C-alpha cells in the first residue's frame, strides 16, 4: 500500500468539488486544504504551536533551499525534517525544480539534469532526478515531488512539448531512484504550459507511471486567471479520481474557491505570508493595507468577522504602528491572521461541499470580498 492514500467522502452536487481525506504516515487531513509554505524548515515568523492553533494540518518544505542550507545530511542526522523542526504533522517537499528554473539566466538544462549557479555565491551546482530523490529521502517528508522541468509561460509549443517529454523521462527516473516508498509518497507533476493537448499528453504519460498522487505544475506563474482555470478544468479530467490532486503555487482566495470547484484537493502558496510582511491583510471585505494612514487611529480588529489570535487581541492602529516601526511582532500578527483567514476559508469551502452549495458560497464570498466588480482588487 502506498504511504499516502486518498479517501473520497463526497462530491458537491452543485459544483462537482470533492470532499476527501488524505492519509499520511504523520496523520490525516481533510481536503480541499491549503498548505502554508515553510521554505527553510520554518513558516516565516510562526512557531509549530501557532500553526497547530490556526488548524494548519500540513506544511511545505523547500528541497532546494534546505539542500543548500543547512544541508540534507544535517537534517538526516537530526532524524529527518519532522524532528529537526519539531512538526509532527504531515510535510510535503517540492523537488527543487521550480527554484532552479526560476534562475533562468543562471542554468543549463540537459537530459541528465540541470547545471546552475548558486543564487547567492555563484558556485556551480547540479540537480538531477536522482539527486532530488536523495535529498528528499534524507529530509523524510511524507509527500515528495518528482523533479520536473517548469517551462516559462508563455513558451513556444515545440519547446513545451520537448519539456513535458523530458519531465516524463525524469519522472520515471525519480520512481526508480526513490528509496523509501513505504513511508514517503512520490507525486508526479503534470506540465504543458497553456497547451491543452500537451497537458493531456503529460497527464496520461504520468498516470501510466502510477504515482500515488498527482500535481498540476506550471500555472499561477503570471498567466491571466481565466487561462489557469481553463487549464485546471481541462487537465482534471485526465487525473485519477482515487488519488490526491495538488495544484501548485495557488493561494489567492478567489483561485482557491475556483479551483476547488474544478476538482483540486491541495494548494500551497507563499502569498499569505509574503504579503503579511509588507502589512497587507486578507479580510472578509477584501484586501486591507494596514500601513495606510487612515488606520492610524482605527481601534477595530483587522477583520471584525475573524476570530484569530490577532483579531481577538489587537487593533488596526496598533498593528499599523508595529509594521511602520518595522517591529517583528507586527509581521507575526499579520502572518497569523492571513494564514488563519485562508485555513478558515478552506474549512468554509469543505462545509459548503458537505451542504452541496459551493457555487452559492462562491457568489456570497465574491460579493463580500469585492470580486464581483469589473476590476477586482487583486493580490
Swiss-Prot record:
Q: What keywords were assigned to this record?
A: Glycosyltransferase, Metal-binding, Queuosine biosynthesis, Transferase, tRNA processing, Zinc
Q: Name the SUPFAM superfamilies for this protein.
A: tRNA-guanine transglycosylase
The record lists Zn(2+) as bound by 306, 308, 311, 337
Report residues binding substrate.
Answer: 94-98, 148, 191, 218
User: What is catalyzed by this enzyme?
Assistant: 7-aminomethyl-7-carbaguanine + guanosine(34) in tRNA = 7-aminomethyl-7-carbaguanosine(34) in tRNA + guanine
- Keyword Ribonucleoprotein belongs to the record: no
Q: Which leading EC class covers this enzyme?
A: transferase
Q: Gene3D superfamilies attached here? A: Queuine tRNA-ribosyltransferase-like
Cofactor dependence: Zn(2+)
The cofactor remark states:
Binds 1 zinc ion per subunit.
Pathway it works in: tRNA modification; tRNA-queuosine biosynthesis
Q: Does the keyword Zinc apply?
A: yes
Give the CC-aspect GO terms.
cytosol
Give the record's GO biological process terms.
queuosine biosynthetic process; tRNA wobble guanine modification; tRNA-guanine transglycosylation
Positions of the UniProt region annotated as RNA binding: 249-255, 273-277
Q: Which Pfam families does the record cross-reference, listed alphabetically?
A: TGT
Q: Where is the active site?
A: 94, 268
GO MF terms here are: metal ion binding; tRNA-guanosine(34) queuine transglycosylase activity
Q: Matching InterPro entries, A to Z?
A: ArchSynthase1/Queuine_TRR, TGT, TGT-like_sf, tRNA_ribo_trans-like
Q: How does it assemble?
A: Homodimer. Within each dimer, one monomer is responsible for RNA recognition and catalysis, while the other monomer binds to the replacement base PreQ1.
Q: What family does this belong to?
A: Belongs to the queuine tRNA-ribosyltransferase family.
PANTHER family noted in UniProt: QUEUINE TRNA-RIBOSYLTRANSFERASE (PTHR46499:SF1)
Q: What is the purpose of this protein? A: Catalyzes the base-exchange of a guanine (G) residue with the queuine precursor 7-aminomethyl-7-deazaguanine (PreQ1) at position 34 (anticodon wobble position) in tRNAs with GU(N) anticodons (tRNA-Asp, -Asn, -His and -Tyr). Catalysis occurs through a double-displacement mechanism. The nucleophile active site attacks the C1' of nucleotide 34 to detach the guanine base from the RNA, forming a covalent enzyme-RNA intermediate. The proton acceptor active site deprotonates the incoming PreQ1, allowing a nucleophilic attack on the C1' of the ribose to form the product.
Protein name, UniProt field: Queuine tRNA-ribosyltransferase
Q: Which gene does this sequence derive from?
A: tgt
Amino acid at each position: 500500500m502506498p504511504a499516502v492514500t486518498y479517501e473520497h467522502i463526497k462530491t458537491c452536487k452543485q459544483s462537482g468539488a470533492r470532499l476527501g481525506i488524505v492519509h499520511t504516515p504523520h496523520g490525516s487531513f481533510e481536503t480541499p486544504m491549503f498548505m502554508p509554505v515553510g521554505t527553510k524548515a520554518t513558516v516565516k515568523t510562526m512557531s509549530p504551536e501557532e500553526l497547530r492553533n490556526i488548524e494548519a494540518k500540513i506544511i511545505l518544505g523547500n528541497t532546494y533551499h534546505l539542500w543548500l542550507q543547512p544541508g540534507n545530511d544535517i537534517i538526516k542526522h537530526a532524524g529527518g525534517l519532522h524532528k529537526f523542526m519539531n512538526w509532527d504533522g504531515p510535510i510535503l517537499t517540492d523537488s527543487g525544480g521550480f527554484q532552479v528554473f526560476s534562475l533562468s539566466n543562471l542554468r543549463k538544462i540537459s537530459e541528465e539534469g540541470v547545471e546552475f549557479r548558486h543564487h547567492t555565491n555563484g558556485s556551480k551546482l547540479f540537480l538531477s532526478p536522482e539527486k532530488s530523490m536523495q535529498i528528499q529521502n534524507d529530509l523524510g517528508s511524507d509527500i515528495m515531488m518528482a523533479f520536473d522541468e517548469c517551462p516559462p509561460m508563455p513558451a513556444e509549443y515545440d519547446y513545451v512539448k520537448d519539456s513535458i517529454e523530458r519531465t516524463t523521462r525524469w519522472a520515471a527516473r525519480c520512481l526508480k531512484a526513490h528509496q523509501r516508498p513505504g513511508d514517503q509518497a512520490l507525486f508526479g507533476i503534470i506540465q504543458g504550459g497553456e497547451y491543452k493537448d500537451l497537458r493531456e499528453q503529460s497527464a496520461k504519460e504520468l498516470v501510466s507511471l502510477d504515482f500515488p498522487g498527482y500535481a498540476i505544475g506550471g500555472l499561477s506563474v503570471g498567466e491571466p486567471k481565466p487561462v489557469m482555470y481553463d487549464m485546471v478544468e481541462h487537465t482534471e479530467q485526465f487525473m485519477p479520481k482515487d488519488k490526491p490532486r495538488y495544484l501548485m503555487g495557488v493561494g489567492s482566495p478567489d483561485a482557491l474557491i475556483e479551483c476547488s470547484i474544478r476538482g483540486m484537493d491541495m494548494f500551497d502558496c507563499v502569498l499569505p505570508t509574503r504579503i503579511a510582511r509588507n502589512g497587507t491583510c486578507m479580510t472578509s471585505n477584501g484586501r486591507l493595507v494596514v500601513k495606510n494612514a487612515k488606520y492610524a487611529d482605527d481601534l477595530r480588529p483587522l477583520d471584525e468577522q475573524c476570530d484569530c489570535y490577532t483579531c481577538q487581541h489587537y487593533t488596526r492602529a496598533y498593528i499599523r504602528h508595529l509594521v511602520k516601526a518595522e517591529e517583528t511582532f507586527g509581521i507575526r500578527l499579520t502572518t497569523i491572521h492571513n494564514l488563519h483567514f485562508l485555513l478558515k476559508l478552506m474549512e468554509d469551502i469543505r462545509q459548503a461541499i458537505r451542504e452541496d452549495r459551493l457555487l452559492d458560497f462562491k457568489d456570497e464570498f465574491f460579493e463580500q470580498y469585492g470580486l464581483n466588480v469589473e476590476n477586482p482588487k487583486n493580490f
